[in-house]
């Protein structure tokens, strides 16, 4: 009889390793706007989704290729406290660390092990309580319209535009159009003070421009501001809107090893009061 070598991870149904966690921590912190997040793991990769009511949703996505190691058995889904996850990942401060995540089965904790690169004799392990959670809202189905407006822009440029906008604004108005102004952001602040930024489709910050209809929609400033942390670290951003103004911001963050982490925001427009 041949002995079968036991797995070093026991009966874990999910095991993953990230060699450098700086970008992963930035991504986690950029979506910590609610207490709880839903973790989904499949052969497609890792997703962590956070929602606030039915007005904004953010999903962090890492494909298997973004990990040094990625193993999953069946589809795994569980909830975690986002602030606990963020704090555990930040235990070594700004020190460069590798990360191992392990999850055994429903009701078991998510184990996080950090290994600082500058000290081979040190590591720390956290066991994060998991819980049952509801399925996230599937906004993606609402953005399958062939007449969708799609714009790709350079992340640092868009972040600069947002930083120039009025900080006390109560609402943001987005205009995407095949005609001028091709892409316009207007803030409406206290006493209805208005400030606008226009970006032509020929602007150097534009990477792709494909708008088939004029869409004008307003959003709560607070929700747009929730994208700031991710925006500051993004290399490029896809902006998508459908005919009713459902807004998707799809951001790409690049890690130290050139791996890509994706952050996807869905923001519900305010009702048209015209």
From Swiss-Prot:
Q: Does the keyword Zinc apply?
A: no
State whether keyword Ribonucleoprotein applies. no
Where is it found, in Gene Ontology cellular component terms?
checkpoint clamp complex
Coiled-coil blocks = none
Tissues and organs where the protein is expressed, per its UniProt entry = Expressed in ovary.
In terms of domain of life, where is this protein from?
Answer: Eukaryota
How it assembles, according to the record, is: Component of the 9-1-1 checkpoint clamp complex consisting of Rad9 isoform A, Rad1 and Hus1-like; the interaction with Hus1-like is direct. Does not interact directly with Rad9; this interaction is probably mediated by Hus1-like. This complex probably also forms with Rad9 isoform B, however 9-1-1 complex containing Rad9 isoform A localizes to the nuclear periphery.
Q: What is this protein called?
A: DNA repair protein Rad1
């Amino acid at each position: 009889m041949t002995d079968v070598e036991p797995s070093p991870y026991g009966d874990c149904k999910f095991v993953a390793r990230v060699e450098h966690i700086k970008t992963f921590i930035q991504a986690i912190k950029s979506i910590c706007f609610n207490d709880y997040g839903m973790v989904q793991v499949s052969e497609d990769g890792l997703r962590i989704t956070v929602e606030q009511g039915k007005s904004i949703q953010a999903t962090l996505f890492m494909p298997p290729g973004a990990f040094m190691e990625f193993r999953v058995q069946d589809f795994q889904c569980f909830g975690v406290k986002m602030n606990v996850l963020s704090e555990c990942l930040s235990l070594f401060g700004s020190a460069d660390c590798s990360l191992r995540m392990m999850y055994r089965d429903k009701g078991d904790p998510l184990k996080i092990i950090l290994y600082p690169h500058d000290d081979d004799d040190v590591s720390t392990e956290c066991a994060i309580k998991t819980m049952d959670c509801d399925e996230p809202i599937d906004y993606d189905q609402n953005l399958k319209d062939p007449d969708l407006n799609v714009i790709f822009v350079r992340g640092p440029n868009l972040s600069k535009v947002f930083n120039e906008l009025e900080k006390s604004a109560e609402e943001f108005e987005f205009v995407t159009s095949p005609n001028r102004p091709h892409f316009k952001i207007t803030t409406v602040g206290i006493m209805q003070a208005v400030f606008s930024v226009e970006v032509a489709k020929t602007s150097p910050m534009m990477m792709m421009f494909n708008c088939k209809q004029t869409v004008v929609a307003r959003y709560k400033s607070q929700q747009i501001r929730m994208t700031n942390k991710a925006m500051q670290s993004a290399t490029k951003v896809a902006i998508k809107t459908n005919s009713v103004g459902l807004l998707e911001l799809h951001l790409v963050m690049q890690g130290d090893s050139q791996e890509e982490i994706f952050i996807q925001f869905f923001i519900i427009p305010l009702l048209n009061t015209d």
